[in-house]
Amino acid sequence: MAYSSFELLDHSRPILIFGRDGQVGKALQTCLKDLKAPVVFLGRSDCDLSSESSITEVLNRYQPQVIINAAAYTAVDKAEDIAEHDLAFAINAKAPALMARYIANVSHGILVHYSTDYVFADTKQTAYFESDSTGPVDSLCVYGQSKLTGEQAIEEAFNLASDSCHASYQDKFSRYFILRTSWVYGDGGNFIRTMLRLAAERDQLKVVADQVGVPTSAQWLAEIGLQMVGSRVGSGIYHAVPDGETSWHGLAVFAIETAASYGEGIEIRSENIHPIPATEYPLPAKRPYNSRLNNQKLKKALSDMAFTGQYPHWRTQVEQYVIDFVESSLKS
């Protein structure tokens, strides 16, 4: 996808992107390398997202019209430590709230915020719609609670700004897009790379098979976020995942078989990748068993944008990711 311009943007104001060094942040850098508009990528050394004063200083300095928040506290298990609670909530809830309060009062302002399947707590066995109830909060891990609080803070900030605006300024309303996703992989440490490494080192693997979700490409997530920036679709929560579903075990088998078929030095056989229940691999933070997210709302939005690209299946994206990873490994 090409992003040479965005119709409604004031090109004297930069697009501000938090989370430069994460998987989605790196993908955004690739997507925007040829953009004919100012873009500022911020990492931890540029802005302390646990500090209100640091965030406020950055917003006042750059005065962006668009913010893409690809940053998050993602140490899911570490967040269960009482000493980490405040940091998780500062980065995942308070920081997005500050961004939202700022952008909500900018003419044609846009906030893209990436969220997670962890806001759901196994209240159904089919794919969640955006309208489904989240939580209950006491059934979520701390990471999930902090991300849910961030979502709610964004919605509240934009609702307050909308209520305070005169009707004649409706055409200048700012918008927000909360993109919930799951099982992200890209340029960086992730489940797929871990499985490929272990498959090259071991002749037996055990992988959780009773947690189901949708593997999602960071590159595709970056492209979807930018599609929303360039669109006229309405504010709201959108489930940004490809088609299909699988378990962690299913993903591991598919990725390993794909790598083996393309010449990677993997000897492990599929029958030696053993499915296990999550109870056999206990972790401090509770993970959802059902991470399925219904993507029909996003598909409708893309259709309204006259988006002509083919909506992907997770297998297609994972296959290409593994092929690219194998080829880069062979070159190095």
List where the protein language model places each region:
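Adenosine-cofactor binding site in Rossmann-like domains, unifying the SAM/SAH pocket
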Residues: 33-57
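Catalytic helix-loop patch of NAD(P)-dependent Rossmann-fold dehydrogenases
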Residues: 90-95, 119-179, 183
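NAD(P)-dependent short-chain dehydrogenase/reductase
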Residues: 153-213, 219-220, 227
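NAD(P)H-binding glycine-rich loop region in Rossmannoid oxidoreductase-like domains
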Residues: 52-93
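Mid/C-terminal beta-alpha module of Rossmann-like enzyme folds, strongest
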Residues: 224, 231-284, 326-331
